[in-house]
Structure formats: structure tokens, C-alpha cells
UniProtKB/Swiss-Prot annotation:
Compositionally biased region (Polar residues): 466-506, 574-590, 764-774
Bias-annotated ranges (Pro residues): 728-737
PANTHER family: EH DOMAIN (PTHR11216), UBA DOMAIN-CONTAINING PROTEIN 8 (PTHR11216:SF162)
Coiled-coil stretches noted in the UniProt entry, renumbered to this chain: 602-709
Organism, scientific name: Schizosaccharomyces pombe (strain 972 / ATCC 24843)
Name by which UniProt lists this protein: UBA domain-containing protein 8
Length: 829
């Protein structure tokens, strides 16, 4: 890898990151040191693995300083949205960002977004700039317009355009939240103009924090003269993140008038914040996360971490809004509350949260479901959208506000549902002010000091108030009514203590549970058996009634007229009898418990609907479990089949190995035999060469003989037995007569050895040879059979096409062996 040319900023930041590792060898960092450090940048492990492969091309398992620089560059590009194909370590850019560093800075001080100067974001959009962005909007939308949302650009087109700006994805998430505040996944023309305008501002001023809302004049400057299709950008002040949250859009119902006021309030707050930040230190505010973290129990924290691990299946160390919102939606909280919860934990508007922030969000949701309002949980309201419950109460009766019990003070006033203020007259506060609240202080304190208590704890807190304390305040009817009107009890319980049934009461309902504190547990406890200590509790309760209260005769008739009403959840029976005698009998005799004629609680339509949904969910879960079990069995069968197949393949492999060994042995034997044959062939070749030499010598001899025989002066051929004329004794010639004086010439001598024509004897008269030749002794004549055999051998060679002269010589040389003669003639060809 060639040395990289780093910019001054990159050189400084890369060296700082390397110094934070404290490696033993600064020029060679092992993978065990640099690997865990790279995981802190928040990228998926698959991308980090590819980046490592790009840098460690030699697979050494360690990186030198130049390779670490290249790794930092690639991580920075990946953080800014570059794909794996677009990564290039030769391209300079901004240093990478450590999410952990931003988290540590948040624990030290408030986010810089609270003290940042948002002045550039208050500048209205220039008409020329708006026209340019509108033209760009039309060009990119042409041919891609959705028929369901005409005139709107889908996120699949808008987001790639924004990614070309090379801004960090966290900054782009904030820009998208401000543009598509309703989170419908589409941008209108003016929203696209706002998004492009914010991109230009962030690039020009190098900003990474954006305000949570834009001033109204900036939004208006993004709109052209033509009215927009809708105004969903004004339908929210703060939204969680850059995610597809169409599930939330149908729940938003804030009016445009109300939102415009909020925009003005937000603009004023931003302006005032800028002035305060410029001339003074940042305001000290209460961090809700610190308070809520202290409320999380170790068991809950462990459960929240497990849920976080299931959502973060890639082990990134954080989850984005698209992963968290569907999970948070299961709480059935309002979308505005979920958005507020998200903003509470994502204080830097990064668009993602870690597991600690996720635990805080889950704890807030848990507290919210327990009945506490979001404002009381967070201990302050950053962006109030409507008057608080406390203001409504004070406007009704300012004198009574100081007499409200502890449970309804500033931090807990929102626990009172809206139905209290709407349905009860002003006398309600007077009743609270004039009543003795000592009996209710334990309940109030338990709610205030331990807001994370479970629903069962809340129920027991209301039930632990002794009946003796309630009876001691029987003349204070209003206070008794407060304790008597929990959902588990009935309004007629006050009649037992001599209180008229017409007295108004305040139901202690908790926000989020329409049926009251105990209603959330009613459906669950209806199917459970009666507690074992229920008889003892009722017996003790009646003993307290017997010893602490005297029922007036006029109240007995009221008891007789009243219907059988169930006691609170702790009790399982009603008061038997309707006369004072029956009551006296019940005080002295332990009467058996009787089941009430009417059910203790008739489920409402909403509860029935919820129960139906739960049943459907249970059935769906059962079906899912059955499907999983079936799939598990199928997978198990496939595994067994694959194991069997693997065993078969192993056996076949062993057989193939045996065949291979046998083939190798045969090949070795064949090679040995081949070598032996080669040796034999070599020896045969040597013999052949020797035979050829001998044949050549013999051929030379034959050629010399033939040459001698063809020479006219040669005598070799004459003396040869093969061509030597046969001399036969001439028949006796008659004696010449004297009368004959001239003899005719003799016939010519034939050189044939044919027995039919024997050669004529040579005489002195007709022979040209010397006389001594004639007088030489002649060889004995051959037999007729021998001559006949020699002629047959000669004819056989002649039939093979050999010349006659050479055939005769070859027969002579081989002693008339026709095979040897043929070989000699063939070698001489």
C-alpha cells in the first residue's frame, strides 16, 4: 500500500486516535488492539470486516501506521453513507466520529445542541434559492410520482439526493425530521426546499446540531405563491428520528393553529437561548435521565438490556428509530408522548440510542403505563402544549390548592385524570381542603417516593389504609368517599359507615387506566382463586367495624335497601343479611362466605375488545409456536438426513481411497514392467544393430561377388558352382569320314543350368579358351533331384520379385536356405 497523503486535520485526528490506544509498538498495531477499538465507531461488523480486508491485504493480522490511517479513512466514508464499492482510502475527507465520545461528552455537560448558536437556521430562504430547489424537485420527481400522493417525493428518491451532500447520517437524520415532521415518508415541494436549505446551511457553517423546530417565517419562505397540498410539517414540534413511522402518523391530531403558536414559542425560546448563551453561562436544568436511571432496578435493567440485544441483532451497540419505534408502539402510548420520550433519551438528536438510553426510555414507558403522567415523570415540561392540570385546579379555587394532599402536589398533580376536573364541581377542592388527609399520607408518599413501583404495589398502597382510620373519620364524609371509591370497591361501601349514598366522591383513578388503579388487574384476577388469607382479612375487618363504629338505626334502612355490593379486591364476599339482627349475628358467628349474586366487575366494551385482542394474540402466539415446533422437527429431520448422507459419503470416500491405493499399486507395477520392457527393448535394439552390421558386411560381400560375376574378365562367377556349366560326357561321335572335309559350327553354349539343355562340350576346334581348360578335370555332376530342388528355391525367390542374379547369389551364400536368402535380399533393397 502506498503512503497516504493526509490533510492536516486528518493527520492530527488520526494521531490522536492512535495515541488513545497506547500500543506497545507504534508502527505495528496488532489486531487484538485495533480490532475492539474499531468496533467503537458503531459500524456493522460486516462492513468493518470488509474494511479490514481492504487494509490488511497480506492477512498479517496486524496493521502498520499507514494501514491504520487508511482504515480510519474508510470508516469515515462508511459513516457518511458510502457503499462498499465507493470506499477509497486514497480519497481524503473528514475524520471518523466516535459515538462513545459523544456519549461521554453528554454525561459531562449538557448537549451542545442546547447551547449552540442556531442563528443560521432563522434566516429565511432566498427566493432564488427556493426557485432552484423547486426546479430540482420537479426534475427528480418527473416519472417517479406516486399516484397515492401526487406532488410528493417519496423517501426513496429524496434520501439518495441528500446523501450526496456527504453529511454525516446523524445530521441528515435531523434534517429529515425537520422536513418530514409528520413522518409520512414523503416530502412536498416546500419540505424538499427546507431539506435542501438545511443541507446547505450545515455544509456552509459546518454544523452538526440542528434545532428541534424551525421558525414560522422560515417555513413560510419555503412555500411558493402556489398553496401546498397539506401542511404536515406544522403538525409536530419534535419527532424521534429518521425512520419510517407511518404507524404514528394516523395518531397525530394537533391542529395547525396550535402548532403555529408552538413555532412562535419555539422561535422565541431559540432567540432567547441564543442571547443567554452569548452573554451568560448555559442555564442549569434538571436532567430527567439522571433521576430515571436511579429508579431502574438491577432486574429491570437486565431485562431492558436483553430486549436491546434482541433488537440490535447486528451488535452495533445502538439502535435507530426504525428499530425502536415499532417496539415502543406496543405500549399503545400516544405518538406525541413516544416522540417526547425519544427526545428525552436522544438529547443530541443523533437519530439513534444506546442500551443505557434504551433502558431509560423503557423505564419512562413503564412509569407512564403505571398511571403517572409524562410531565411528572420527567419532573419538568420542556415544551408545554396545553395548560397543566395544576393550573386548571388553581383557576377553580386558588385557596384550596395549598390544601391538596401530597399525592396531588406539583410533581404528582397530573396523576388526577381530566375527568376529575371536568366532572366535579368546585366543592371538590373544598372537600379536599377541609378533610383530614392523615389517613392518606402513606398512600401519597408511597406513590411519590417510589414511582417505579409495580401495579400490585400501587394496589396494595391503597388497600393498606386501615378501616379503623376510615371509621374514625366517618363524620367527614368527603374524605371517606375518597378512600371508598377505588375501582375494586363500590360507592355503597360508605353506607356501611353511616355515610349517605348521595355524597359526591372523587374516584382515585390513575392516568392510563380508565377503570382505576385496580382495573388493570381485574381481568387477570377474575380467573384466580380467592386468596388464602381472605377469610382472616374479612374477619379482622368486621371486628374492627364492630369495635369502632355504632350504626345508627336510620342507617340500617339504607343498608337494607342497598343491593349486595362486592367489597374491594381483597375481599371475596358481600355483607350477608339486611337487618341489624343479621348484622349482629354476623358479628358473633362466623358465617360462611357466599358468592355474590352479581359479578364484582362487568367488563366494559373496551376491556372486552382488549380481552379479545389478547385471546387473538394468544392464539396467534400458539400458532406461531406450533409453526416453530413443526419447523424445528423439519429441521431436525433434515439434519438427520444430512448426517446419514454424510456417513454414506464418508463410506464412499473410504472406498474411493482404497480404490485409489489399489490403482497406485497397479500403476507402480506397470511402471516397473515398463522399465523392464524398456531395458529389454534396449538390449534387442543393440542386437538388432549388431545384426544390421553383420548384414551390411554380408551385403558388401554379396555385392562384391555380384560385381565379380558381372565382370567379363572375372573368373569368380565362372568358378561358382551355381553358374558353372554342367559338363556331361559327350556322346561318342562317329569317326569322321574322309569324304567330309568341312564341319558345320557347333550350336552356341547356353549358360543355363537346366537339365533339359546340357551345355555342349568344348572341343579344341570350337573353343576359344586355352587348351589347358579343356584338359582340366571336371567336377562330378549334380543329381537331377538336387538340381530340381535348387530350381524350385530359385523360382520361389523370383516369385517374390527379386532379381535372378541376386537370388542365385543369395542361395549360394546361404547354402540354398530360402529364408536366409530372402532376408539377405530384403536387407539389400
Amino acid at each position: 500500500m502506498q503512503p497516504l497523503q493526509l490533510s492536516p486535520i486528518e493527520q492530527q485526528e488520526f494521531d490522536r486516535l492512535l495515541e488513545s490506544l497506547h500500543p506497545e509498538q507504534k508502527d505495528l498495531i496488532p489486531g487484538s488492539v485495533i480490532g475492539p477499538f474499531l468496533l467503537k465507531f458503531g459500524l456493522p461488523q460486516k462492513i468493518l470486516a470488509k474494511i479490514w480486508d481492504y487494509c490488511d491485504q497480506e492477512d498479517k493480522g496486524s496493521l502498520d501506521r499507514n494501514q491504520v490511517y487508511a482504515c480510519f479513512r474508510l470508516i469515515s466514508q462508511a459513516q457518511r453513507g458510502a457503499t462498499l464499492q465507493e470506499l477509497d482510502y486514497n480519497k481524503a475527507g473528514d475524520p471518523p466520529i466516535l459515538p462513545k465520545q459523544a456519549k461521554d461528552d453528554h454525561h459531562i455537560k449538557r448537549s451542545s445542541s442546547e447551547t449552540a448558536d442556531f442563528t443560521p437556521f432563522r434566516i429565511p430562504i432566498n427566493p432564488d434559492e427556493r426557485s432552484e430547489y423547486e426546479k430540482e424537485f420537479r426534475e427528480n420527481l418527473r416519472g417517479h410520482e406516486d399516484s397515492a400522493r401526487p406532488g410528493c417525493m417519496p423517501s426513496s428518491i429524496a434520501k439518495p439526493i441528500l446523501l450526496k451532500s456527504s453529511l454525516h447520517y446523524a445530521v441528515l437524520a435531523q434534517i429529515w425530521n425537520l422536513a418530514d415532521s409528520a413522518h409520512v415518508g414523503y416530502l412536498e415541494m416546500y419540505q424538499y426546499v427546507i431539506a435542501r436549505h438545511l443541507v446547505a446551511i450545515c455544509k456552509q457553517y459546518n454544523l452538526i446540531h440542528l434545532p428541534r423546530s424551525l421558525p414560522a417565517d422560515v417555513i413560510e419562505s419555503a412555500k411558493s405563491e402556489t398553496p401546498a397540498m397539506n401542511t404536515n410539517i406544522e403538525q409536530g414540534v419534535t419527532q424521534p428520528s429518521l425512520v419510517n413511522t407511518e404507524q404514528l402518523s394516523h395518531q397525530q391530531s394537533i391542529s395547525s393553529t396550535k402548532s403555529s403558536k408552538l413555532d412562535e414559542i419555539s422561535a422565541d425560546n431559540n432567540a432567547q437561548s441564543a442571547v443567554d448563551n452569548k452573554y451568560s453561562s448555559p442555564p442549569q436544568t434538571i436532567d430527567p435521565q439522571a433521576n430515571i436511571k436511579a429508579l431502574i432496578t438491577p432486574e429491570d435493567r437486565s431485562n431492558f438490556y436483553q430486549l436491546f440485544s434482541k433488537i440490535d441483532n447486528e451488535n452495533k451497540g445502538y439502535i435507530v428509530g426504525g428499530e425502536a419505534v415499532p417496539f415502543f408502539m406496543a405500549s399503545h402510548l400516544d405518538s406525541e408522548e413516544l416522540a417526547r420520550i425519544w427526545d428525552t433519551v436522544d438529547t443530541q438528536d443523533r437519530g439513534y440510542i444506546d442500551k443505557d438510553e434504551f433502558a431509560v426510555a423503557m423505564e419512562i414507558i413503564k412509569l407512564r403505563l403505571s398511571g403517572k403522567s409524562l410531565a411528572s415523570i420527567l419532573a419538568y415540561d420542556d415544551n408545554p402544549t396545553e395548560p397543566t392540570m395544576q393550573q386548571n385546579l388553581v383557576s377553580d379555587d386558588t385557596n384550596a390548592s395549598t390544601a391538596v394532599p401530597v399525592a396531588f402536589t406539583n410533581d404528582n398533580v397530573s396523576n388526577v385524570p381530566l375527568s376529575v376536573a371536568d366532572n366535579e364541581p368546585n366543592s371538590t377542592l373544598n372537600l379536599l381542603a377541609s378533610s383530614d388527609t392523615a389517613a392518606f399520607e402513606p398512600t401519597a408518599v408511597s406513590l411519590h417516593e417510589n414511582p417505579s413501583s409495580s401495579l400490585e404495589d400501587l394496589q396494595s398502597a391503597f388497600q393498606n389504609t386501615s378501616f379503623q382510620d376510615q371509621v374514625s373519620t366517618q363524620n367527614q364524609a368527603n374524605t371517606a368517599d375518597i378512600s371508598q371509591n377505588t375501582e375494586s370497591g363500590s360507592s355503597t361501601q360508605g353506607q356501611m359507615f353511616g355515610i349517605p349514598p348521595t355524597t359526591q366522591s372523587i374516584p382515585l383513578k390513575m392516568a392510563g387506566f380508565p377503570g382505576g388503579v385496580n382495573s388493570s388487574l381485574t381481568d387477570i384476577k377474575e380467573e384466580e382463586a380467592v386468596s388464602e388469607n381472605a377469610p382472616q382479612q374479612e374477619e379482622r375487618s368486621f371486628e374492627q367495624i364492630k369495635t369502632s363504629i355504632h350504626i345508627a338505626p336510620e342507617n340500617i334502612s339504607a343498608i337494607e335497601e342497598s343491593k349486595s355490593v362486592p367489597l374491594p379486591t381483597s375481599f371475596a364476599t358481600t355483607i350477608p343479611g339486611s337487618t341489624s339482627a343479621a348484622l349482629d349475628d354476623q358479628q358473633t358467628t362466623e358465617a360462611p362466605f357466599e358468592e355474590p349474586d352479581e359479578p364484582a366487575h362487568e367488563p366494559t366494551e373496551e376491556e372486552q375488545e382488549e380481552m379479545r385482542k389478547l385471546e387473538e394474540k394468544i392464539e396467534s402466539t400458539k400458532y406461531g409456536l406450533e409453526t416453530i415446533q413443526t419447523s424445528g422437527k423439519t429441521i431436525k429431520q433434515r439434519i438427520e438426513q444430512k448426517k446419514t448422507r454424510l456417513m454414506i459419503l464418508r463410506e464412499e470416500l473410504q472406498e474411493l481411497d482404497a480404490i485409489k491405493e489399489e490403482a497406485q499399486k497397479q500403476i507402480s507395477q506397470s511402471l516397473i514392467a515398463d522399465q523392464q520392457l524398456s531395458t529389454q527393448i534396449g538390449s534387442v535394439g543393440m542386437g538388432k544393430k549388431q545384426a544390421v552390421k553383420e548384414l551390411r558386411k554380408l551385403q558388401a560381400k554379396i555385392d562384391s561377388i555380384i560385381a565379380d560375376s558381372m565382370s567379363p574378365m572375372g573368373t569368380g562367377a565362372v568358378n561358382s558352382p551355381a553358374i558353372k556349366p554342367q559338363v556331361t560326357p559327350a556322346p561318342p561321335t562317329p569317326a569322321p569320314t574322309p569324304a567330309v572335309k568341312h564341319h558345320p559350327p557347333p550350336p552356341p553354349v547356353r549358360s543355363s543350368i537346366s537339365p533339359s539343355m546340357p551345355p555342349a562340350p568344348l572341343t579344341h576346334a570350337n573353343s576359344s579358351t586355352p587348351m589347358n581348360y579343356v584338359s582340366q578335370p571336371e567336377s562330378p555332376p549334380q543329381s537331377y533331384e538336387s538340381i530340381q530342388n535348387d530350381n524350385e528355391l530359385l523360382q520361389e525367390l523370383l516369385s517374390m520379385g527379386f532379381p535372378r542374379e541376386k537370388a542365385v547369389i543369395a542361395l549360394e551364400a546361404t547354402n540354398y536356405d530360402v529364408n536366409e536368402a530372402a532376408n539377405i535380399l530384403l536387407s539389400s533393397v
